[in-house]
């Protein structure tokens, strides 16, 4: 396959397409799982940073600030290599699962841990922004009704926080999907790694500059198209949510203005 037509013929090979689509599936699974776990960890970190301000809980705030700043100001690839080398893998991943060998499963687990640790630092700041958007008066109102701080957070603050940050969280999903391509550096079987494996299997990518440019163009072009379709779809969802949110704000503003004008007319 020394021509572009020959390279395009790879896209008509069902085995190659299936192999790459499995990489897409693993990319989505890794990314969504990383975001979900990161939301839990990031929420805890944001709460610690915002509300652990007393003498007894000040150390928790300091730890959360340290965690967030360390992971937000260091590269993801660094943590991927650190976790691959030092992070222990639990016994349940040390076996064949999902059509993967035990070695691949351990790599997948360790790389996912790195992605979760890194992403949770980013999401902590997103959640903290949502927490800051909730009026402190609502917390005081909850306390006056006899609610505990835990109940106030669970029933009053966090629901409003997550409604406010949904578009930003979806944007973070896009970033995490793109960041997952770093996992190819440690042979985790996501989209980019599988694209490189297809080239390697065809003796078109051997690390010695022996590269068929047309094969690279076709396969990496396919990977880029897949990334674009997934992320553009999420991006459009974010835009629609933001437009809907702005529309609701405009309607509320217009309704309030109409009430004021009606009230002034009545008083006149």
Question: Model-derived features: where do they sit?
Answer:
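Transmembrane alpha-helices and adjacent helix-loop boundaries
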Residues: 1-268
């Amino acid at each position: 396959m020394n021509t572009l037509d020959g390279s395009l013929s790879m896209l008509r090979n069902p085995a190659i397409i299936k192999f790459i689509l499995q990489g897409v599936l693993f990319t989505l699974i890794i990314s969504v799982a990383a975001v979900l776990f990161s939301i839990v960890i990031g929420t805890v970190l944001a709460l610690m940073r915002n509300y652990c301000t007393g003498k007894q809980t000040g150390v928790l705030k300091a730890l959360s600030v340290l965690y967030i700043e360390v992971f937000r100001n260091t590269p993801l690839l660094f943590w991927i290599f650190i976790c691959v080398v030092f992070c222990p893998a639990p016994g349940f991943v040390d076996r064949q699962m999902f059509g993967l060998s035990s070695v691949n499963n351990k790599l997948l687990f360790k790389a996912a841990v790195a992605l979760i640790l890194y992403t949770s630092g980013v999401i902590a700041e997103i959640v903290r922004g949502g927490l800051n958007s909730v009026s402190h008066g609502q917390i005081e109102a909850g306390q006056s009704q006899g609610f505990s701080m835990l109940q106030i957070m669970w029933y009053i603050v966090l629901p409003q926080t997550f409604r406010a940050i949904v578009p930003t969280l979806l944007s973070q999903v896009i970033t995490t999907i793109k960041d997952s391509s770093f996992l190819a550096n440690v042979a985790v079987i996501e989209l980019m790694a599988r694209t490189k494996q297809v080239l390697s299997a065809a003796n078109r990518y051997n690390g010695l500059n022996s590269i068929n440019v047309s094969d690279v163009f076709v396969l990496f072009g396919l990977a880029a198209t897949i990334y674009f379709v997934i992320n553009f779809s999420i991006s459009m969802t974010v835009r629609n949510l933001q437009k809907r949110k702005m529309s609701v704000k405009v309607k509320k503003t217009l309704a309030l203005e109409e009430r004021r004008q009606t009230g002034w007319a009545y008083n006149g």
